[in-house]
Each structure stands twice: as C-alpha cells, then as structure tokens.
C-alpha cells in the first residue's frame, strides 16, 4: 500500500506539467498563480492532516516553500526554452540522483542484503530512461543551440531546488506531515516575490490564470502524499517513485502538446519509457527487501 501511495504523486506531477504546457500565459502571471494555488491547497492539506506547527517545522517548511518557488520559476523557463518533453526527464534524473545519494549516504537506506545493488540498478534504468526521453538528433526539429543552452541551465537549477527539500526536512528532523502547512506559507510568500520581481509585461489578472492555479493545487496534493510516503518507504524510494510522472509528461508533451520529434527520437523515447518502467519494478523490489531494516541516523 505504501508503494501505491508513493506512485500517486507521479500522476499528479505529470498532469501539472501538461497543464502548464497546454495553457501558457505571461510568465509572471503563471508563476504567481501556481504559487497561490499550491500555497492555498497546502494549507488545506495541513488542516486535514491536523499536524502541529513547531517553530522548527515552520522555519524549515517556509524555507522549503521558497526553494520550490525558485525551482518552479526555473522549470517554467525551461518549458519555454526547449519544451516539456525535454525538461521533465532531465530534471527528474538529476533530482533522483541527488535524493538517492542523500538517502543512501546520510540516512542509511537500502541496507538489506542485495537492496543497494537492486536500488542502484533501478536508479540507473530510470535515469537512462530520462536521458533517452530528452535526447535530440542534431538534424531534427527542435530548439536552437541558444534555446538548448538556456533550457539546460534552467533545468539543472530547477532540479537542485526541487530535489533538495525532502532530504533537507529529514536532515533537520522535521516530520514531513508537519512541514506541509509551513510550506504553504513559503509558497504564498513566493507568490508575492514572483509578483514583485519577475518582469511586468502584463497584469497579474488575465487569461489562463485558473489553469495555473489548478496546476499548483495538483502539486500541493502530490507533495503532501510524497512527503508522507518518504516517511513510510524512505527518501530514496519515496522521492524516486513520486518523480515517475516524467513518463506521463514526456508522452503527453509529444501527443497532447504536439512537441516535434523525429521518428528516430520517438523510438528512443519509447525505449526510455520502457527502461523507466523496469526501473520502477526494481525500485519496488528494493524497497520491499529493505522493509524492517532500521536506517541509521
């Protein structure tokens, strides 16, 4: 059951990417609306969970909310530079590498005999699948070299900011459920910063603000489930399973958003998706092997 819960965020995160890609609008308006939706729903999730707000949880939760705000700004920049189907696989792979490394090295995950080897193989397959999904032929349709450079830089920045907060909360010993509400406050503060700092090319209120706010709400629900799942199955496994939404985002980017790919690129993407699914199965096995082994602190 814990594995099934850990998979739900991947569907929500994948749908979020497609929603933002399908309804683009002014970058300041879109970012602000996403943060407002995410912040408001996070506060609602916190009320439903009924978790206490300690001083430590509030401080670190707000910090994590601001980190996610920065990651979202960069990922939307990357979407516009080189598309959803290239951004999501790469940012996913980098986040997986970061969190799995921290989960194993700092928190002693995958300690059961054979679990570490199986987990590493699973991660390698998922990362290989992500790389395959973002691969582009030199002569094929797609972004210019300048757009690829901007997209790569923005994607790397988003991965660092997105991928750090689950392990940060565990490192400072803040229960994940306790951080959901404070993260909502950080996201609302991030909305204010987006409104103040990002270029003012259009008014905040305008077309397609509702889909952006809805996307933020989807993320907040997925985030609450992800943070709870990391407590049940560990950071390395919980975060990894939640990030498999890149499969949905990649396929949706090609079919729903109509992002251009050559026939060879589509074949490589299909192979990448297959590799990621195999990695998912192995990740579930590694997690089940690790059950009952207490991680070191």
PLM features per residue range, with description:
Residues 1-297:
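Polytopic alpha-helical membrane proteins, predominantly small-molecule transporters/carriers
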